[in-house]
């Protein structure tokens, strides 16, 4: 769910897994969304979402599917950096592979264990559990069938694990993407699993039992997944985005699926065709109590001439973000907003290749009752450094992420590695903002922002932790964590857990 510092109680939402030149002036990073005298009252802190050891701190977790394990290239692993009073850091780190005692399977070349990761409370205890996709896993003679593993959190970090999904045939690549939520309303967490040309669900992750949600030609690409209550029935729904290319036509889709208790399955209840998105995220950006859907780097990908599926065409330059607002009585999507870096009040300038919205994350940073949106632009140029990358923190308000005049709300700011208080230097190819996520890593009740730069240091990668989504904090890299050398670039942070 979007992480809230303090907010009213609302329907639970789960965050999913989920990913070339412009000039951006250096931006100071004071707390972007300072609370005002009119801020909403603050009843309680949000529950921790990725506290695997139950110590009161959310933990940072990163899939490294290109990692070498026991000499096996791209066998893959997951790096868990435990939170603490000063945030995540090398003080407590766990590297999880298929050679780890608790984990089923064996490291093999090309397994890509850690290809997707998500946190979920599968077994109903106080510890978050780690769900891991391995889309390259071979199952018996079935090549690249893929698998999903649930590793259970304990007071000592992790204990037992079980397989929650196995691909049924070669090329299924189960675990290409993941989302977790209680879709059925039975209080138990369910999993949505992206594979090749299909999405399946497991309504009992304690066993490897999957059921189809949808199947379509996706050209081998991983579907983008997130969750939110878009039909206002009190249950989380599944949002998925994908596009086909020359199979036989090029077309793109956003689809919503909700639980149909009469049929005992997920049912499609809303579609938008020909508007592709590189990222999806849900949140209540206008504070009306209904979940909204953000489509990152939304643009038309279609052979047909469809009018503006992502809003005004000029706002797709450099990457546009399109918001479909929730509402009562089946009115989801009727109200919309679209913006890019050329929108008034937005830091930066929209240029081709920016990738604005390639990564999204949601939290109510200032606890005013309106969710705020973080948008990564990994292709952003900083000065002459192409693809150095940036992130923009967009403040939610009564009208959503724009004010009545159509400008970005006051307090919207940009972050990049040349900004005061941000560690490091913006360099070509860093891809800062390639992935973003929230977690309360220092336990103060305020969402902390994680920003990945998978191209940092010749694609070794790194993750920045910004406490309270402001300047300062720390950086973790493969070198600082003591991760082993790999035959392939690690691109640490490209698969950033939520």
PLM regions: where:
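A detector of repeated loop/turn-to-beta-strand junctions in beta-rich toroidal repeat architectures
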Residues: 73-77, 90, 129, 142-147, ...
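Short glycine/acidic-enriched loop and turn motifs that connect beta-strands
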Residues: 66-71, 136-141, 198-199, 243-248, ...
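Acidic/hydrophobic-patterned starts of short beta strands in beta-sheet-rich repeat architectures
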Residues: 54-63, 124-135, 185-194, 232-241, ...
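Blade-edge motifs of beta-propeller repeat domains
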Residues: 2-6, 11-48, 82-112, 149-173, ...
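Hydrophobic strand positions within the blades of repeat-based beta-sheet folds
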Residues: 60-62, 78-81, 96, 113, ...
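Extracellular low-complexity, Gly/Ser/Thr-rich intrinsically disordered linkers
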Residues: 355-362, 368-373, 393, 429-468, ...
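Beta-propeller blade termini
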Residues: 43-58, 63, 114-127, 175-183, ...
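Mobile, glycine-rich extracellular loop/lid and propeptide segments
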Residues: 57, 61, 109-123, 127-137, ...
């Amino acid at each position: 769910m979007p992480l809230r510092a303090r907010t009213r109680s609302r329907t639970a939402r789960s965050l999913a897994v989920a990913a070339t030149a412009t000039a951006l002036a250096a931006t100071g990073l004071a707390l972007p969304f300072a609370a005002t005298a009119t801020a909403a009252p603050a009843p309680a802190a949000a529950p921790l979402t990725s506290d695997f050891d139950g110590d009161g701190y959310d933990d940072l977790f990163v899939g490294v599917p290109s990692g070498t394990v026991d000499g096996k290239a791209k066998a893959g692993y997951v790096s868990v950096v435990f939170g603490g009073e000063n945030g995540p850091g090398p003080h407590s780190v766990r590297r999880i592979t298929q050679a780890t005692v608790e984990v089923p399977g064996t490291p093999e070349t090309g397994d890509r264990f850690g290809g997707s990761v998500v946190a979920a409370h599968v077994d109903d205890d106080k510890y978050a559990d780690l769900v891991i996709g391995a889309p390259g896993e071979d199952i018996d003679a079935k090549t690249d069938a893929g698998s999903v593993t649930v590793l259970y959190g304990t007071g000592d970090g992790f204990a037992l694990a079980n397989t929650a999904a196995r691909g049924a045939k070669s090329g299924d690549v189960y675990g290409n993407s993941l989302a977790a939520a209680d879709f059925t309303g039975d209080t138990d967490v369910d999993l949505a699993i992206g594979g090749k040309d299909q999405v399946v669900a497991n309504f009992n992750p304690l066993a490897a039992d999957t059921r189809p949600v949808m199947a379509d030609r996706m050209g081998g690409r991983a579907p983008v997944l997130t969750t939110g209550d878009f039909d206002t029935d009190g249950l989380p729904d599944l949002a998925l985005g994908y596009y086909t290319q020359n199979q036989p036509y090029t077309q793109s889709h956003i689809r919503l699926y909700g639980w149909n208790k009469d049929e005992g399955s997920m049912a499609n209840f809303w579609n938008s065709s020909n508007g592709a998105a590189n990222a999806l995220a849900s949140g209540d950006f206008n504070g009306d109590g209904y979940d909204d859907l953000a489509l990152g780097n939304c643009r038309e990908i279609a052979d047909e001439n469809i009018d503006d599926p992502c809003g005004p065409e000029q706002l797709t330059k450099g990457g546009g973000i399109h918001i479909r607002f929730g509402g009562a009585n089946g009115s989801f999507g009727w109200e919309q907003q679209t913006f890019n870096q050329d929108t008034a009040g937005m830091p930066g300038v929209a240029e081709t290749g920016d990738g604005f919205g390639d990564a999204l994350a949601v939290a109510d940073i200032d606890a005013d009752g309106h969710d705020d949106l973080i948008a990564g632009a990994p292709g952003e140029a900083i000065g002459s450094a192409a693809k150095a990358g940036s992130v923009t923190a967009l403040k939610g308000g009564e009208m959503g992420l724009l004010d009545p005049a159509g400008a970005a709300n006051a307090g919207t700011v940009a972050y990049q590695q040349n900004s005061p208080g941000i560690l490091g230097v913006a360099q070509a190819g860093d891809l800062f903002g390639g992935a973003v996520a929230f977690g309360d890593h220092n336990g103060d009740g305020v969402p902390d922002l994680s920003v990945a730069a998978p191209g940092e240091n010749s694609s070794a990668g790194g993750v920045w932790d910004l406490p309270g989504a402001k300047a300062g904090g720390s950086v973790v890299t493969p070198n600082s964590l003591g991760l082993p050398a790999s035959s392939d670039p690690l691109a640490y942070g490209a698969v950033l857990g939520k």
